[in-house]
């Protein structure tokens, strides 16, 4: 999640936005560390969202923070779930991957109707979450022939795939 957060923040900053972001190692505004530590909870999100200089927020969100205090925001434009894996089990009432999927789904369920949920097309739990969303859905996969990606694009959906050493965006038959 931290790598994804940093990558998104870097891309947005290079498009001339003033970016604030939170990760498991700190709170940053324009790449300047404002606070060190695990800042993936709602208090850190509020820190970024209340800063008048921040034009674009990228907020890494951990399951523990969601369980304890929620997200720190009500709605967002884009929500990303990179995966749902067993290494995140064992906190509070999260005993299996279905429990974890329910917690992580809170992020993409907060996406505005005209916003985007970006989900792992190779993760069965992410695909299940996608079916219940009312926002736009984009999938990603390292496998250009991933069945979920093929089906999603055949239905006119958008996906990002790794193809011939490049990240390729697909929509329908278009690349």
Q: Language-model features: where?
A:
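A conserved segment at the C-terminal end of the G1
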Residues: 3-25
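Short polybasic amphipathic segments
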Residues: 25-29, 160, 165-174
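Flexible active-site lid/hinge loop adjacent to a nucleotide/diphosphate
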Residues: 33-152, 174
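Conserved catalytic and cofactor-binding micro-motifs
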Residues: 154-159
């Amino acid at each position: 999640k931290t790598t994804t957060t940093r990558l998104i923040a870097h891309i947005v900053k290079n498009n001339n936005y003033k970016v604030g972001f939170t990760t498991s190692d700190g709170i940053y505004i324009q790449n300047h560390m404002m606070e060190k530590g695990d800042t993936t909870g709602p208090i850190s999100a509020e820190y970024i969202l209340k800063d008048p200089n921040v034009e674009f927020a990228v907020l890494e969100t951990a399951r523990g923070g969601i369980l304890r205090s929620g997200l720190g925001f009500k709605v967002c434009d884009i929500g990303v779930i990179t995966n749902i894996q067993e290494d995140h089990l064992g906190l509070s009432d999260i005993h299996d991957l279905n429990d974890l999927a329910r917690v992580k789904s809170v992020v993409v369920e907060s996406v505005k109707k005209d916003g985007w949920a970006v989900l792992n097309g190779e993760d069965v739990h992410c695909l299940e979450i996608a079916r219940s969303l009312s926002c736009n859905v984009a999938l990603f996969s390292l496998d250009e022939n991933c069945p979920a990606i093929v089906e999603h694009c055949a239905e006119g959906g958008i996906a990002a795939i790794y193809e011939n050493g490049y990240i390729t965006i697909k929509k329908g038959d278009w690349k």
